[in-house]
Amino acid sequence: TVMLMTSPIVEENLNKKVIPQYTYARIYFKNSILEEHIDRPECEISVTISLGGEYDNLWPICIKDYEDNTNCIKLDRGDAMIYYGRDLKHWRNKFNGVSQYQIFSHYVYADGKYKDRLFDGRKNIGLP
């Protein structure tokens, strides 16, 4: 899966071992808004990957850094952003295109508080 394939990239960028949690895909449609939020505690590290869609302009994801500065990042098809989803508020303003396809993968630190949460506590990947 995408989550397993991107684990080494996340580890290389963070210089730390991670444990995969879960992945999901989402399709956003015209006028969609992703409200400002933080992810649940077990989402220590998050990755969002743009799969493209039907739009004239890239739809930025906005994130507040640890000093409360807002940064809005435009991801083109195939681009990814690694971020601390449980720590940093993130959102997307109104989408003006037709559709936007996105994959989200979440990880925890292999030596952290949630190290026993492989696959979000499931016995196998992809099973409830």
Residues covered by each model-derived region:
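Signature of the catalytic double-stranded beta-helix
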Residues: T1-Y24, E36-I38
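Secondary-structure boundary elements
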Residues: E12-V18, G53-D56, N96-V98
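Conserved active-site beta-strand element of glycosyltransferases/polysaccharide synthases
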Residues: I27
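Catalytic core of non-heme Fe(II) oxygenases with the double-stranded beta-helix
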Residues: K30-D87, W91, S99-I103, A110-N124
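Low-complexity, Gly/Ser/Thr/Pro-rich intrinsically disordered linker/tail segments
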Residues: L127-P128
